[in-house]
Structure formats: C-alpha cells, structure tokens
Amino acid sequence: MLNASYLLAIICRRFWRYVWKIRCVFPSKSLTTFFLNDGSRFDYPLKTAIGCSLFRGEFESHEIAFLQETLKPGSIFLDIGANGGFYTVIAAKQVGVTGHVYAFEPGHSELEILRHNIAINHLTNVTIVECAIGNKTGKAQLAISSDGAMNSLAKTNHPQQCIEYWQSVEIIKLDDFIQKSGIKKVDFIKIDVEGAEKFVFEGFKNILLSDNEIKIMFEASDLNASAFGYSVKEFLENILSSGMKLYYFDKTSTLVEIRDYDPKFGKKIYNFVASKDELI
C-alpha cells in the first residue's frame, strides 16, 4: 500500500505536468500577474520556465531571502541580466529611496517587460542600462530565444534555448561602466547571463579590489559555460584562488561554503555566492 507522502508526490508531479501542458494555451507574450512576498507586483509571461516556477511559488525563494537579508537602505545593487526585472523590483524596494538599482538588459522584449514592471511598482530608484556586460567594451551578438530567460551571447547546449534570431547589442565591461557613471561603491551584484558569467567577472576586477564587503550572486553550469570555452570547475577555482569565499545553495537551499570543487557543480545549474568575508 502506498504511503501518504509518496502518493502526494505522485499527485503533485501529475498536477504540475498538467499545468505545464495547459500553459501552451496562453499567448507566449501575454503577461500574468504575480504578487511577491514584499507586496510588489511582477508581471511576466506564464509560458516560460520562470513563469511556471513563479506560478508554483518555487522561483529562487531562498536566493531572494538572502538578497533581502543582505541589502540595506542605501545599498547599490547591480542586476546583470535583469530580464523582466524580478530581482530588480525586489532589490529596489529593499534599498529604498537612498539606494539605487542598475538593471542591465540588452534584449528588446525583455526591456519592455522590465520597464513595465518598474512602472507598475512606481520605482524611482532604478536605472535601466540597455547593454550586455562582459570582458570587453564594444559590440556583440545576442541569441534571442523564444523564452527570453535563455537569451545568451552564444548558442548554448541548454535544451530550452530555442534561438529565433540574433540581435546586435552594446557590450561593456562593468569597470568601464562604474568609472563612467561615477559610482563610488557597489554592495551586491547578481549575474544571470546564460554562460557568460566568467567573462562578467573578468570585466570588474577594479570593483573587486576596491569593495571589500561586496556580495556577488551568480549561476553557473557546464551546459551553458561550455559554449563560451570554459568549465565551471575552472571558473570556481579561479574565484577561490583569488582569495574570495565561495558558497552555494544546496538541495535544502541552505548556504554552504565551498572549500574544494565538487564535480556535481558542473552537472546542473546551481546558484553561487562569492564574498570577501565569511557569510556563515
């Protein structure tokens, strides 16, 4: 006889499989409204991986809790790969009118959603920067996917990256942007750029030298990194060798320190946090 927890797991799997199927009746660009735990409103297409995760109430809740715990009124937050602005909206509310959020997004469709979400939340402390971030300043080609969260500066091995066309975009090193903008201090950087994370790091060496309390949250997997010619192992070991502390969110979403590379990190997408000081 099936025990209750096993039966519940089966029911849940079948329910969400059904939800995943019926999402296809929604027009791909129509927006669904989600209300976040801080009272903010976030509109996003349901027919996407992020949209379905939001519908299930499962989208990076522990990462958001860490962000909200870390950011203070007056903090400066950089959202690199802002997409529709999920992190931007939450961070803007957290840092308040004395803080500021810089949201970097090169994709045209994503920029429309980002502007929309900033407007409906009446946010006045956000600057949108229409460009990609990397280890050079100039021009680049962005692969536009049917699911905007899969947009990337390369054709990756991610099965959900369905490229519709390529878009020419501006790209800039973060150090160059900081210098041009006159930003004195950066408190938190979130990076989600579908494989180009290592190149983003290479472009803000001056920030790492000057800001001792900076926190950097980023994702990485070999599925995406391999398209850019590097491995997650190489990337994480470079961070550790620089003297920074490195952490990841485990299966229970607890923040765990990384002292040595574990092969599991390359096999699936993990969210990591790099910091100069101890977090746990």
Give the location of each predicted region.
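Phosphate/nucleotide-binding beta-alpha loop and adjacent structural elements of enzyme active sites
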Residues: 1-280
